[in-house]
Amino acid sequence: MTSLSWITLLAFALSVAFCLGFRGLAREWHLIDIPDARKRHDGNVPLCGGIAIFLSFSAATFLAFGVSGHANAMALLPGLVLILVAGVLDDRFNLPVAPRLAIQLLAAFLIIAITGLTQTYLGLASDGIETAAASTPEMLIQVLTGPLFLIIALAFIVGLVNAVNMSDGVDGLAGSASAAAFFWLAVIGFGIGEHRLGLQALALAAACLGFLVFNMRHRWRARASLFLGDGGSTFLGAALAGFILILASGTAAVAFPVLIWIVIVPVIDTLSLIVRRMSVRRSPFSPDRQHLHHLLMDAGLSCGQTAVAVMALNLLAGAIAYIAIRFDIPVWPMLLALAVPAAAHTLFVLRMTRGARPIVTASMAEANPTTKPNITYPGATS
């Protein structure tokens, strides 16, 4: 059996085993999701999926490579641990937004510092530029370095952490979408010769699939028996951001704007939500039911169909990134083409929300008891 096969199978098997083992412990630790006005699921569901995915990925990686795996990917672990712990604490104690963001920023800084990332490849240079001009505006758009790189990298990590977290609202959605993204990161890693990084990304995809045995709705499972929790969704977002930044650096770097395609679905949905919430003077982190998955369910899809649809969109977006890399499509067209999914998302949101009554949050409903909240949807898990 090849290393590719056994590492993938090991990560999957460990994930299933850890999910089974931690379900009882999660109840003892009070890591459970209790149904309320916003969460419409049956019974108290353990929030230990993220812990299981992290442990299975880490164990499979160390058993396969020891400490000789891809140096930057191994260096992600301290920051990922901090993100995971902060998310688990949020699951347990419902932390305020400010300390959550502070911990996420610290974890993002650890990821950048320990991996030694100092630049990201943009690939936006024009052909035919004279060498003498390469030290001024050319270098600015070809390779991003210095304080500007640090600011953008921090924003990217924290942004993707929260984008994946916000997308975790339907059984199987965040896990399957993340598995699709890690799959394409693995394929791209193998394609540019980063085999250890590719194996580690594939191990994470397999660990997500092991979790989906308990979280994805299918013929033999009517509803999820295990949730990712904030610890899991934020960990997956940080891991995706870290792998993308690693692939966008080094001697065989892939252009960052091309890699963005792999996570474009949660990125566009989150940016759209932030703009819409702030336009009505609401916090970007306030809950509502205006996410893409909510609107897909409003359009008539079931919970399971919604998860599959979003996963398919992620697979398609990742395939576009791979095709661009495989056939050396210039970066500028790929960057400009990001307007297509953004426009499609905007048109879909406008169509689904046209004529809809204003969204009412739980806090607004408490302030005015005569107002009926409009924040839930059958089948949504968070």
Regions found by a protein language model. Name each.
Residues 246-382:
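C-terminal membrane-associated helical module and adjoining short loops/tails
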Residues 1-268:
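"…together with the soluble PPM/PP2C metallo-phosphatase catalytic core" -> "…together
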